[in-house]
């Protein structure tokens, strides 16, 4: 909704952005609390396997917080685009929707992995496939963005805002894959 700003009121857009900022701040605090707790646990008498598990959990917590950072960065890019009254073409909106659908698919897969009590190494493969789709789509959109600017389909600055959102969505996919890798490493 925040991306397609044509029909949305400014109050709604500000409220949505404020909510994203609020949850990112909560995520920051949770990361610190969890990391502090795990660090205290690691200072105790643990086997080398226990210490390795703590290291993996710290990595997962950090990557989950990076997902929140990425969502906040994406919201900030959208806010900046809206403040400068940049409006995306229907094709750009469609492409953003497609990219967000891929990142949502990656997030759903991550949640599936987090819920599983037992995993095998091959459980990571669908996440790699989704990440490859995200990377390939981002690369394709970068090429088309340059072509569309050259063909005067939209202004250069509109293309910058557009690629900021696409690039941040791709980073979000990276962080999601990192969480999946850490969780699978811990559970197998």
How would you label these PLM feature ranges?
Residues 5-188:
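Cytosolic, long alpha-helical scaffolding segments
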């Amino acid at each position: 909704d925040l991306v397609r700003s044509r029909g949305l009121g400014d109050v709604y857009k500000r409220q949505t952005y404020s909510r994203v900022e609020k949850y990112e701040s909560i995520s920051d605090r949770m990361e610190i609390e969890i990391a502090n707790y795990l660090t205290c646990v690691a200072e105790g008498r643990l086997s080398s396997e226990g210490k390795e598990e703590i290291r993996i959990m710290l990595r997962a917590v950090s990557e989950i917080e990076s997902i929140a950072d990425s969502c906040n960065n994406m919201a900030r890019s959208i806010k900046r685009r809206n403040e400068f009254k940049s409006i995306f073409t229907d094709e750009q909106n469609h492409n953003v929707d497609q990219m967000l659908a891929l990142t949502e698919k990656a997030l759903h897969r991550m949640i599936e992995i987090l819920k599983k009590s037992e995993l095998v190494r091959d459980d990571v493969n669908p996440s790699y496939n989704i990440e490859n789709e995200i990377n390939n789509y981002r690369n394709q959109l970068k090429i088309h963005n340059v072509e569309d600017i050259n063909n005067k389909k939209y202004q250069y600055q509109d293309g910058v805002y557009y690629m900021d959102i696409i690039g941040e969505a791709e980073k979000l996919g990276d962080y999601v894959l990192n969480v999946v890798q850490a969780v699978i490493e811990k559970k197998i």
